[in-house]
């Protein structure tokens, strides 16, 4: 894990550690997300945030959760600010079937030259795979991505 990844986590990922951990998938995704966040905290990787993330997070009805999620984002080293460029790219992505927020997150991740955009939303991952040739960022599930980049015993 020597590469310096630039990582954009969507709101689903940022909320995952605070979800009820009753299902195996949720627990495993949480572990992967916490490991990713830890690598960002130590400076091994770079966490990216955006105005779009903050706007969506602030729509969360639970004030305590908002504060917890924003606390995670406070370690971000790069912040993407919205601008005219965002509107045009969001419109392009919405024509492909992305929701407004998903399109804005993808556009923000692209703008920041993110290496990876992580989401626990299976529908968004599938849509992104369908249109991967038209996106400037890879979109993946955090557990699947983290499992791919962890060095295996043979790599050591």
Regions found by a protein language model. Name each.
Residues 77-122, 126-130, 155:
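Active-site neighborhoods of divalent-metal-dependent phosphate/nucleic-acid chemistry enzymes
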Residues 20, 60, 93, 130-131:
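Residue-level signal for well-ordered alpha-helical positions
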Residues 33-38, 69-70, 106:
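Short amphipathic alpha-helical segments and helix-helix/interface helices
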Residues 8-61, 78, 142-144:
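PIN/NYN-family metal-dependent endoribonuclease catalytic core
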Residues 59-74:
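Short, electropositive alpha-helical surface patch
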Residues 1-6, 21-30, 110-156:
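Acidic, PIN/NYN-like endoribonuclease modules and their adjacent C-terminal/linker elements
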Residues 55-56, 85-89, 142-150:
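A short acidic, often aromatic-flanked loop/helix-cap motif at beta-alpha or helix-coil junctions
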């Amino acid at each position: 894990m020597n590469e310096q990844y630039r990582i954009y986590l969507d709101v689903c990922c940022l909320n995952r550690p605070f979800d009820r951990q009753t299902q195996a998938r949720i627990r495993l995704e949480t572990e992967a997300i916490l490991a990713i966040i830890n690598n960002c905290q130590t400076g091994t990787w770079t966490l990216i945030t955006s105005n779009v993330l903050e706007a969506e997070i602030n729509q969360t009805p639970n004030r305590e959760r908002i504060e917890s999620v924003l606390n995670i984002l406070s370690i971000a080293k790069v912040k993407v600010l919205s601008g005219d460029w965002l509107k045009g790219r969001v419109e392009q992505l919405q024509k492909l079937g992305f929701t407004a927020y998903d399109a804005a997150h993808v556009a923000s991740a692209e703008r920041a030259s993110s290496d990876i955009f992580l989401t626990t939303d299976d529908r968004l991952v599938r849509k992104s795979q369908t249109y991967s040739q038209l996106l400037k960022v890879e979109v993946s599930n955090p557990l699947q991505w983290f499992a791919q980049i962890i060095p295996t015993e043979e790599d050591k």
